[in-house]
Swiss-Prot record:
Its main location: cytoplasm. It catalyses: (6R)-5,10-methylene-5,6,7,8-tetrahydrofolate + glycine + H2O = (6S)-5,6,7,8-tetrahydrofolate + L-serine. It comes from the Bacteria. Catalyzes the reversible interconversion of serine and glycine with tetrahydrofolate (THF) serving as the one-carbon carrier. This reaction serves as the major source of one-carbon groups required for the biosynthesis of purines, thymidylate, methionine, and other important biomolecules. Also exhibits THF-independent aldolase activity toward beta-hydroxyamino acids, producing glycine and aldehydes, via a retro-aldol mechanism. Homodimer. The modification N6-(pyridoxal phosphate)lysine is found at residue 231. This is Serine hydroxymethyltransferase.
C-alpha cells in the first residue's frame, strides 16, 4: 500500500506532504510512551479520510436541518448503537469533537454558572476540564478540589466525603488524566447520593480497559460518563458521552445546538469502526497486554531505583517521581526525546516545581502495545530509560537499542512512498 495521504497531497502542497511524511517516520522510529496516545488501525484512518467529511449534518439521525443525510444517518446510528452495546449504556452521544467538549456538554446540561463542582485536583492527577482556573470549567463554576492522601498517594475517599458534605456540590466528578490506580466508582456514587449530587465520570484514559472488562465500569454508577475515543480505546481523536436515558434529551440539546454545530461525520464513522474493533477478542487480548506491559515496566523501573507515585500501577500508566534522580520532568522529557523515546513531563502530587518544569514524567503502554511490545521488551525499555537518565550507557548505544525495538515491531509497514 502506498503512502496514499502523502502522494495525494504532495503535488498540491509539498510542504504539508513533507510534514506528514516526517510525522509518520517519527512515529515509526521512536518509542511512544505518552499515555494518552495510540496508533489507529488503517480502517479507522481510512474512514477519517472518506467523503463523509463533505457533508453538513446539524441535528441527529432522522432529525437533521439539512437534506441528503440518509447515509450520514446510517453511519451515526451505527456508532450510537455500538457505543451503547460496548459499554452497556442507555444512551450515547457520539458527536463531541473532543473529550473537553464532552465534559463541557455535561456541565452545560445540568449546571448553571456559579454552581459547585467537586473534582480532582489537576496537580494530583485530574484534568484541565475538571476545574483548573485557567480552563473554562474553573472560570464558570465554583470548583472544590479533592486530592490524594500524602502517604498512600491514592484518592482519599474520606476527604471526598468531607468536602462533599461541607460544600454540597451539584456535581461530583470522578476520573483523571494521571492517576495509576483503580477508582472506586461505587464509593463515589454513595458520596454523591449522600449529598444529592449528580455523579459524572471522565473515563477517557481507561475506556479501552473498561470496554474489555478489565477495569470496573462507571456506567452503572454514574449519571454521565464521558470519554475520548482515542487513548486506550484506539479510535480517532474525538469525544463520547454515555448517560441514563432520562438525561438523553438534555445531553443531546447541550451538544447541538448548545455548544456545537455540524458534527464531524467522517470522525464519527471512524469512531464506529473503532467501536466495532473494540468488540473483538483481539481487542480484549490487546488490553490484557497493555496491563501486562505496564506491570513489567513499572516493576523494572522500581528495580532500577525509580520511585513510582503510589508505588506502582493498576492500569496503563504510571507516574515516575524523578526527585531522587536529580533531574526535572522537563529535562527528562527532553533527554529521552533526544534518544527517540517520547513521554511527557508531569506534576506529581504535592509537586513544588512549576507545571512547565515538574518533578515527574508520565509513562503509558497503549501505543507500544499496539506495535506488539511484550513484557521482555518493556524491561528493556525500563533499562533504556534508566541508562539514559543516569548516563549509564553511551547515546549511540541507546539509540541503537531503541532502533532495534522499533525495527522488531514495525509500525504502519503497509505504507511506502
Amino acid at each position: 500500500m502506498q503512502m496514499y495521504f502523502y502522494n495525494l497531497v504532495k503535488d498540491t502542497d509539498p510542504e504539508i506532504a513533507e510534514a506528514i511524511k516526517n510525522e509518520l517516520k517519527r512515529q515509526q522510529n521512536k518509542i511512544e510512551l505518552i499515555a494518552s496516545e495510540n496508533f489507529v488501525s488503517i480502517a479507522v484512518m481510512a474512514a477519517m479520510g472518506s467523503p463523509l467529511t463533505n457533508k453538513y449534518a446539524e441535528g441527529y439521525p432522522n432529525k437533521r436541518y439539512y437534506g441528503g443525510c440518509e447515509y450520514i444517518d446510517v453511519v451515526e446510528s451505527i456508532a450510537i448503537e455500538r457505543a451503547k452495546k460496548l459499554f452497556g449504556a442507555e444512551h450515547a452521544n457520539v458527536q463531541p469533537h473532543s473529550g473537553a467538549q464532552a465534559n463541557m456538554a455535561v456541565y452545560f446540561a445540568v449546571l448553571n454558572p456559579g454552581d459547585t463542582i467537586l473534582g480532582m485536583n489537576l496537580s494530583h492527577g485530574g484534568h484541565l476540564t475538571h476545574g483548573s482556573p485557567v480552563n473554562f470549567s474553573g472560570k464558570l463554576y465554583n470548583i472544590v478540589s479533592y486530592g490524594v492522601d500524602p502517604e498512600t498517594e491514592t484518592i482519599d475517599y474520606d476527604e471526598v466525603l468531607r468536602l462533599a458534605k461541607e460544600h454540597r456540590p451539584k456535581l461530583i466528578l470522578a476520573g483523571a488524566s494521571a492517576y495509576p490506580r483503580i477508582i472506586d466508582f461505587k464509593k463515589f456514587r454513595e458520596i454523591a447520593d449522600e449529598v444529592g449530587a449528580y455523579l459524572m465520570v471522565d473515563m477517557a484514559h481507561i475506556a479501552g480497559l473498561v470496554a474489555a472488562g478489565l477495569h470496573p465500569s462507571p456506567v452503572e454508577y454514574a449519571d454521565f460518563v464521558t470519554t475520548t475515543t482515542h487513548k486506550t480505546l484506539r479510535g480517532p481523536r474525538g469525544g463520547l458521552i454515555l448517560c441514563k436515558e432520562k438525561y438523553a434529551k438534555l445531553i443531546d440539546k447541550s451538544i447541538f445546538p448548545g455548544i456545537q454545530g455540524g458534527p464531524l461525520e467522517h470522525v464519527i464513522a471512524a469512531k464506529a469502526v473503532a467501536l466495532k474493533e473494540a468488540m473483538t477478542e483481539e481487542f480484549r487480548n490487546y488490553q490484557i497486554q497493555i496491563l501486562k506491559n505496564a506491570k513489567a515496566l513499572s516493576e523494572r523501573l522500581i528495580e532500577r531505583g525509580f520511585r513510582l507515585v503510589s508505588g506502582g500501577t493498576d492500569n496503563h500508566l504510571m507516574l515516575v517521581d524523578l526527585r531522587n534522580k536529580g533531574i526535572t520532568g522537563k529535562d527528562a522529557e527532553k533527554r529521552l526525546d533526544s534518544l527517540n523515546i517520547t513521554c511527557n513531563k508531569n506534576a506529581i502530587p504535592f509537586d513544588t516545581q512549576s507545571p512547565m518544569v515538574t518533578s515527574g514524567i508520565r509513562l503509558g503502554t497503549p501505543a507500544v502495545t499496539t506495535r506488539g511490545f511484550k513484557e521482555e521488551d518493556m524491561i528493556e525499555v525500563a533499562d533504556i530509560i534508566h541508562d539514559a537518565l543516569t548516563n549509564s550507557d553511551t547515546d549511540d548505544n541507546i539509540l541503537q537499542r531503541v532502533k532495534a525495538l522499533c525495527e522488531k515491531y514495525p509500525l504502519y509497514s503497509e505504507f511506502r512512498e
